[in-house]
A protein has these predicted regions:
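Structural recognition of an alpha-helix C-terminal capping motif at a helix-to-coil junction
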Residues: 49-56, 60, 70-82
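Hydrophobic alpha-helical core bundles mediating ligand binding, dimerization, or RNAP-core interactions
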Residues: 22, 26-33, 55, 77, ...
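Hydrophobic recognition helices of helix-based DNA-binding modules
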Residues: 33, 37-40, 58, 62, ...
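Sigma70-family region 2
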Residues: 14-15, 42, 55-69
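N-terminal module of bacterial RNA polymerase sigma factors
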Residues: 1-31
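Short, charged helix-capping/linker segments at alpha-helix termini
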Residues: 14-24, 34-53
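Phosphate-coordinating loops and pocket residues in cytosolic domains that bind phosphorylated ligands
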Residues: 27, 52, 67
Length: 84
């Protein structure tokens, strides 16, 4: 997914609480976060639970994402690293 599209989806989440936009973000980033967590020594259950926490944080804090400072994937993985 192109960064411009992702930025637009995150903006919809932050401004409109758009569940459809969140669903697209979820489908895009959840498998990547989950794989990252498993690669970093979490078991499948722990990785799935933490992935849910990361996505929940993205939903709650979408307005804090600044596309001028980082790409969305960088921001999402930073959240995962902090929660890990």
């Amino acid at each position: 997914m192109e960064n411009d599209k992702v930025v637009g989806l995150v903006k919809k989440i932050s401004e409109e609480r758009d569940e459809g936009a969140f669903s697209q973000i979820f489908d895009f980033i959840a498998p990547k976060i989950n794989a990252y967590l498993i690669k970093n020594n979490l078991n499948i259950e722990q990785a799935e639970e933490l992935t849910q926490e990361v996505l929940s944080t993205i939903w709650i804090k979408a307005k804090l994402f600044n596309p001028e400072k980082s790409k969305f994937t960088t921001w999402a993985f930073t959240i995962a690293k902090i929660k890990k």
